[in-house]
Structure formats: structure tokens, C-alpha cells
UniProtKB/Swiss-Prot annotation:
GO terms for biological process: negative regulation of cell growth. PANTHER family: CELL DIVISION CYCLE ASSOCIATED PROTEIN 4/SERTA DOMAIN-CONTAINING PROTEIN 2, SERTA DOMAIN-CONTAINING PROTEIN 2. It comes from Homo sapiens (Human). This is SERTA domain-containing protein 2. Acts at E2F-responsive promoters as coregulator to integrate signals provided by PHD- and/or bromodomain-containing transcription factors. May act as coactivator as well as corepressor of E2F1-TFDP1 and E2F4-TFDP1 complexes on E2F consensus binding sites, which would activate or inhibit E2F-target genes expression. Modulates fat storage by down-regulating the expression of key genes involved in adipocyte lipolysis, thermogenesis and oxidative metabolism. Interacts with XPO1; which mediates nuclear export. Interacts with TFDP1; modulates transactivation activity of TFDP1/E2F complexes. Keywords: Cytoplasm, Nucleus, Transcription, Transcription regulation, Ubl conjugation. Its main location: nucleus. Pfam families: SERTA. The lineage of its organism: Eukaryota, Metazoa, Chordata, Craniata, Vertebrata. It is found in: Nucleus; Cytoplasm. The gene is SERTAD2.
Length: 314
């Protein structure tokens, strides 16, 4: 390998790296040529993808490496090789420079100790060890995926055991019946629980029973329920109760009743009673006419009609 800063020179009689494509006829010469080509290919990939993080890659070196990869690709096309698999070759005897002592991490998972790319005893062709440069330029992941030498048989996945639809449907019915049970759906609830515990045929026979048996089951179900649960099973649920009884049953509103006109007996014990004379005295400064304490506290309907006409007219 050339040192850092050294120029690459081409020898016309050298079997080749960048010149004419040599097609050797003998077996050992072909193996040596394939070894050289594989070594150059690996070194080119290493230089192309292993850059220092703080230095920018040189454009001239990148162009030379890409040209070398294109030449190897043209040779592979002329030889008619199929899509090869990339495997790193044996390390050269000369120690590389400091920049390329370690292999790039992108190709670390591709090293296979069992097979050598240019083993003489292997039955695979020698060109199958090389990867075209077009695959490298198009997608970096295509040449990183190594194909297995002996594909393993696909494992047969056992299909998951599917539960019958009736069981899931009956369990859903059970949940619904627990949330909102009614007297009309007790027959369906008993049939659903029986279908979960027993077979589907037994559930079908129970659904086809007469109305007398269903009424007997309803009575047994109502007897088995606790006393506080009987309120929820009635069809007239919340008909006798009002919203105030439910929401404001635990709230003592006697402390918050400040209206003197609507004071009840409970408020009279806690608040001082307000007479009509005191109320008229407090309302006297806001009235246009003088109000006497003996005047009855009432509203005239004609004044209300006049006020409504004024409001509608405005």
C-alpha cells in the first residue's frame, strides 16, 4: 500500500489495477488476480467510508476511489457475474497507514470466520466475492446486507389459538349486564353465563325454553341479589327521585339562604327575622315616591306591563 501523500502510478505491463482488463487463463493466475482485485476493492471501500471526523475528505481521493470502483464494476459486468456478496479479504502483509488501521464499523458485522472469499476448496465462484460500485453508490445498505451461505429453513409459526366468538361476545354481554342490568335482559345474561361455563349447545337450549322457566330464573336471580341492588334492577329507576335529592342531599343549604322573603323555619332559628317595615325603609332611598311603613308591599301589574313595553321597544 502506498504511504500518505504518495501518487499512484500505472505500469502498462502490470496485471491489472487500472489499465487494460486482463483475462488470465490459468487457475493460479486467475486466483491471484481475483485476490488483488478483492484487496483493492476492500481498501477502496475502507478509504471511501472511513473518514476522520475533524477533517474534510479530499475530492481528488474520492474521485480516484470512485473511478476504481467503477472499473471493477465494468469487469464484473463483462465477466457476467451475478450479484455478489461482500466479505472482507485477508489483511495484507504491509501495515497500512495510521488513517486505516482499523476497519470501519459498517463492515464489522460482515466478517465470517468460516469462509474465505478466495478459498481454493470452495465451490462458489470467485467473482461472487465482489460487489459492484453501483450498488454502493445507490444505497449504502445494499452491500452491507450479507446473504447467508446456507439459507436456513423457515420456521413454521403455529397459528394462535383463536377463542370462539361466542365466548368473547358473552363476556362482553356479562360486562354490560353488570354495569346496567334490567329485568328484560336477565334471560340473556343467564344464557351468556351458561355459554361461558358450558358448551354452546347447552346455551342454545336454554335460550329456547318457555316463558315460565325464564320467569322462574328471574325470580331466583332477584332472590339471590342483595337488598340494595334491587333498586337498580327495577325499570322505573330514578323516577321517584329528583335531581336535588341526589346532588344536594348531603349539603346543608340553610347557611347559604340569604333571601329574607323566602326564609323557612330552619333559617328563622339561625337568622333574625326581617319585617316588611325594615325592608321598606331600606328600599325607600331608591324609590321615586315616598314609601310609608303602612303601605302594603305589592307590585302593580300595569307598571310591569309598562316596563315590558319599554324594554321591547328599546
Amino acid at each position: 500500500m502506498l504511504g500518505k501523500g504518495g501518487k499512484r502510478k500505472f505500469d502498462e505491463h502490470e496485471d491489472g489495477l487500472e489499465g487494460k482488463i486482463v483475462s488470465p487463463c490459468d487457475g493460479p493466475s486467475k486466483v491471484s488476480y481475483t485476490l488483488q482485485r478483492q484487496t483493492i476493492f476492500n481498501i477502496s471501500l475502507m478509504k471511501l467510508y472511513n473518514h476522520r471526523p475533524l477533517t474534510e475528505p479530499s475530492l481528488q481521493k474520492t474521485v480516484l476511489i470512485n473511478n476504481m470502483l467503477r472499473r471493477i464494476q465494468e469487469e464484473l459486468k463483462q465477466e457476467g457475474s451475478l450479484r455478489p456478496m461482500f466479505t472482507p479479504s485477508s489483511q495484507p502483509t504491509t501495515e497500512p497507514s495510521d488513517s486505516y488501521r482499523e476497519a470501519p464499523p459498517a463492515f464489522s458485522h460482515l466478517a465470517s470466520p468460516s469462509s474465505h472469499p478466495c478459498d481454493l476448496g470452495s465451490t462458489t465462484p470467485l467473482e461472487a466475492c465482489l460487489t459492484p460500485a453501483s450498488l454502493l453508490e445507490d444505497d449504502d445498505d445494499t452491500f452491507c446486507t450479507s446473504q447467508a451461505m446456507q439459507p436456513t429453513a423457515p420456521t413454521k409459526l403455529s397459528p394462535p389459538a383463536l377463542l370462539p366468538e361466542k365466548d368473547s361476545f358473552s363476556s362482553a354481554l356479562d360486562e354490560i349486564e353488570e354495569l346496567c342490568p334490567t329485568s328484560t335482559s336477565t334471560e340473556a345474561a343467564t344464557a351468556a353465563t351458561d355459554s361461558v361455563k358450558g358448551t354452546s349447545s347447552e346455551a342454545g337450549t336454554q335460550k329456547l325454553d318457555g316463558p315460565q322457566e325464564s320467569r322462574a330464573d328471574d325470580s331466583k336471580l332477584m332472590d339471590s341479589l342483595p337488598g340494595n341492588f334491587e333498586i337498580t334492577t327495577s325499570t322505573g329507576f330514578l323516577t321517584d327521585l329528583t335531581l336535588d335529592d341526589i346532588l344536594f342531599a348531603d349539603i346543608d343549604t340553610s347557611m347559604y339562604d340569604f333571601d329574607p322573603c323566602t326564609s323557612s323555619s330552619g333559617t328563622a332559628s339561625k337568622m333574625a327575622p326581617v319585617s316588611a317595615d325594615d325592608l321598606l325603609k331600606t328600599l325607600a332611598p331608591y324609590s321615586s315616591q315616598p314609601v310609608t311603613p303602612s303601605q302594603p308591599f305589592k307590585m302593580d301589574l300595569t307598571e310591569l306591563d309598562h316596563i315590558m313595553e319599554v324594554l321591547v321597544g328599546s
